[in-house]
Amino acid sequence: MKALPLVALLVLAAGCGSTKPPAAPAQTSSQSQTKHADAEQRAAMLMRAGDLEGAARQYGEAARIAATVENVDSVASNAINQSIVYQWLGRDAEARDALARVLDDPRRPFSERRRLQAELRRAIVDLSLQNPVSAATFAERAAQRCANLSCEYAATILNVQAQIALESSRAADAEQLAARAAERARSRNDRAEQANALRLQGKARRLQEKPKEALQPLEQALAIDRDLADPRKILADLTELSLASSAAGNRDAAKDYYERAVTVSRALRDTRGLAEMEAQLRRP
């Protein structure tokens, strides 16, 4: 799932009544909102600078301050963003724990949209933690919630379910789910999810020993991700293209895609991604 945009701060109204509110509480509330805005701005600035560690801390701080002024939407958005950044850092357990602010707190009136986003994010994190059973549970919860909304997340949910099918050795099911996801994404002009679906289609075909048929959707995914300038997705596309080319017997193409993937990974300073990619490419 993509990082969510920072939400606008809610303006808290003063209490009703004929007497003027005490100055100190009003000042405290104003200070809290200022600190909240500052934390969100610092998180965004650190993200742009590539300081993921600092951004994760600031998203957590923004969520904490939002809780003190009962800005539940901001609690959710910052917790979800913190989870995304932790996962980019390879800290999957902390990515899961960040979502507890939303998923483990039934008292706060989070919107259906925020709960769905958190459930989807948890499914993605559980996949990284190699827990496809839990991932399937949260993906199904998100799918049920999606049915109650004018749902913009249908393609994302189908892609997550396709990934779960791949992790469960059900490549044929994964290919069908990814095809449905690609169709839904195209209908909404959601190019990022369309690329995700095409990449999953390609991987599913490769795992069904159809590597030549895998190349076209993977090339389409790469073209979209290059247009979107998404380096992490480009790395995933190049890795899959190297694997599919090797399986199809085209060693020169496989080597070219591999070398390009290494270049992208090193530019990202993504040591975890580089290690995972090299491990995949060493497999027979």
Residue ranges and their predicted role:
Residues C16-R64, T68-S77, N81:
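N-terminal leader/linker segments that initiate helical-solenoid repeat arrays
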Residues T28-S30, A67-N71, R108-S111, A147-C151, ...:
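Short coil/turn linkers that connect adjacent helices within long alpha-helical scaffolds
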Residues A37-D38, S77, Q117, T156-I157, ...:
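Residue register of alpha-helical TPR repeats
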Residues Y59, A66-A67, Y86, P106-R107, ...:
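Eukaryotic all-alpha helical interaction scaffolds
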